[in-house]
From Swiss-Prot:
Database matches in InterPro entries: Ribosomal_eS19 (IPR001266), Ribosomal_eS19_CS (IPR018277), WH-like_DNA-bd_sf (IPR036388), WH_DNA-bd_sf (IPR036390)
Gene3D superfamilies, per database record: Winged helix-like DNA-binding domain superfamily/Winged helix DNA-binding domain
Species: Drosophila melanogaster (Fruit fly)
Name of encoding gene: RpS19b
A Pfam family recorded for this sequence: Ribosomal_S19e
Protein name as it appears in the record: Small ribosomal subunit protein eS19B
GO biological process: cytoplasmic translation; ribosomal small subunit assembly
């Protein structure tokens, strides 16, 4: 299965599998305040998923694979949303840069992401290798089961 890249895999399946890999590897340090963090000021509550930090890290890695280099400001735009103001009109609002910064710092500590000299961050060869390896596993499972890619989750 050489030649299979992240671009050819369903993003939801890849993100779930990468998050499971990051959690299983134990290299990602989840900050203590992650339990109380909201992912943006447009959100009303903190995430209900206990593993949301791993999912966010996996999503950031996928984004860096496709569009690198990117900084914290770019990710606040990517994860932005609509702030509901009650009876007043809704407005566009950027996401929290604190949780993005913590995720990038955790990925840097795990040697998956590094700083780019022109600004922002990019994937390391190890991070790119991990993403490609997981994409190949997903395709192998798909061919083995002959199931659609969206139905496959490897752990």
């Amino acid at each position: 299965m050489p030649g299979v890249t992240v671009k050819e895999i369903d993003q939801h399946v890849l993100t779930k599998n990468m998050a499971a890999f990051l959690k299983k590897s134990g290299k990602i340090f989840v900050p203590e305040q992650a339990v109380y963090m909201k992912t943006g000021k447009f959100k009303e509550t903190a995430p209900t998923d206990d593993d949301w930090f791993y999912t966010r890290c996996a999503s950031i890695m996928r984004h860096l694979y496709l569009r690198s280099p990117a900084g914290v400001g770019a990710f606040t735009k990517v994860y932005s949303g609509r702030k509901r103001n009650g009876v007043r009109p809704s407005k566009h609002c950027r996401s929290s840069d604190g949780c993005i910064r913590k995720a990038l710092q955790a990925l840097e500590a795990a040697n998956m992401v590094e700083r780019h000299p022109d600004g922002g961050r990019k994937l390391t060869p190890q991070g790119q290798r991990n993403l490609d390896r997981i994409a190949n596993k997903i395709v192998a499972k798909q061919r083995e089961r002959s199931a659609p890619v969206s139905m496959i989750i490897t752990t």
